[in-house]
Amino acid sequence: MGSASDSEVMNHCVETLQEHDIDFDIVVASAHRDPDKVRDWVLNAKQRGNRVIIAAAGMAAALPGVVAAYTDLPVIGVPMKSDLNGLDSLLSISQMPRGVPVACMSIGKHGAVNAALFAIRILLVNEYKKDEKPQGGLQQRDLFEHPWKKGGHPWNQVRNPRHLPR
């Protein structure tokens, strides 16, 4: 998190990770105020066993981009609400230059929960095998069933349905 003030929203991320028995670290470090701390933490993330990084930040929201600049691990950015209702954060995180990939979630609580769920999906990718359900973590239902899946959504009309989960 870029600031301790982000913890109220990011607790929703923490709870989601805990519900699925995912180990994680929590670090508060601002890309603007503590750039050396951010760099050192990110450069050692793989050695600590981190496989995905969720970075939450508000206003200028530089943290996710700075993190992505220092690692090849997947980085998920969570924009925090600010004076502009989080739009400044959302735009900062979503508009990364080429070569600095950051997955951008929605603003606030929903983004924090979705960041955790997306991180879990990333962690489970290696466990997927053709025509098999994921092992551990989330159930197939949790990952792919949506209220609109049974009818009408454009995903149901894709040309090559074998790529869609069943």
Task: Mark where each language-model region is.
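Glycine-rich phosphate/diphosphate-binding loop of Rossmann-like nucleotide-binding domains
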Residues: 1-33
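Short, ordered loop/turn segments at secondary-structure junctions
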Residues: 4, 29-31, 58-59, 80-83, ...
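C-terminal binding/interaction regions
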Residues: 4-8, 85-145
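Short glycine/serine/threonine-rich phosphate/pyrophosphate-binding segments
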Residues: 6-11, 34-38, 57-66, 85-87, ...
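Structural motif
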Residues: 25, 51-53, 73-77, 99-104, ...
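N-terminal beta-loop-helix "entrance" segment that forms/cooperates
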Residues: 26-48
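Glycine-rich phosphate-binding loop
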Residues: 41-79
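N-terminal low-complexity segments that are often proline-rich with Ser/Thr-Pro
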Residues: 133-166
